[in-house]
């Protein structure tokens, strides 16, 4: 999915971002989405949409259904944000998040989808940057993606918060 510039006066900058004169910065992000459940992947893509916020635009999605595919894709360094399903099987997104954070140099920010609101401590253990509990709330999910999308290219650490 290729995105068009935010405005006719937008100019691309290195790192996949586009800055527009007068409007501030539009963060264009590529997202890797991991879940073994196609319905969960569809729900996430629909909830986030193409523009989760005025200043954040999803330029591409890559869906993965297996942990080895995620690891291979993340090692390529082509993604700005990872969304991992904590309820995926046989490898859950929480354990996969911890593995990626410990093994991948400069791992992109990670948003984990937890099974319930009380699983925030698991998200903290996994070293996730943000967590959104199920059932998925489209506003919370889009907000979390936008928050992490704004950190792309900066050293701002968000910390493991439940959104």
How would you describe each model-predicted region?
Residues 81, 129-132, 138:
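Conserved phosphoryl-transfer motifs of two-component systems
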Residues 27-49, 82:
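Conserved acidic segment of CheY-like receiver
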Residues 115-131:
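Alpha4 helix (beta4-alpha4-beta5 surface) of REC/receiver domains from two-component response regulators
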Residues 152-163:
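CheY-like receiver
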Residues 80-101:
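Conserved phosphotransfer microenvironments
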Residues 43, 136-145:
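C-terminal output helix
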Residues 63-81:
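Acidic, metal-coordinating helix/loop segments flanking the phosphotransfer/catalytic sites
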Residues 104-109:
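His-Asp phosphorelay/catalytic-motif detector in bacterial-type signaling
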């Amino acid at each position: 999915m290729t995105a068009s510039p935010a405005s006719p006066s937008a100019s691309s900058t290195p790192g996949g971002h586009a800055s527009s004169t007068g409007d501030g910065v539009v963060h264009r992000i590529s997202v890797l989405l991991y879940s073994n459940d196609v319905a969960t992947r569809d729900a996430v893509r629909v909830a986030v949409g193409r523009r989760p916020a005025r200043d954040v635009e999803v330029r591409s999605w890559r869906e993965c259904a297996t942990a080895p595919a995620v690891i291979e894709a993340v090692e390529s360094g082509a993604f700005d944000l990872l969304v991992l399903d904590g309820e995926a099987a046989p490898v859950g997104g929480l354990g996969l998040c911890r593995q990626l954070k410990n093994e991948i140099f400069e791992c992109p920010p990670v948003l984990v989808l937890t099974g319930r609101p009380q699983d925030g401590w698991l998200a903290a253990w996994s070293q996730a940057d943000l967590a959104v509990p199920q059932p998925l709330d489209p506003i919370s999910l889009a907000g979390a993606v936008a928050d992490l999308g704004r950190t792309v290219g900066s050293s701002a650490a968000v910390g493991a918060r439940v959104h």
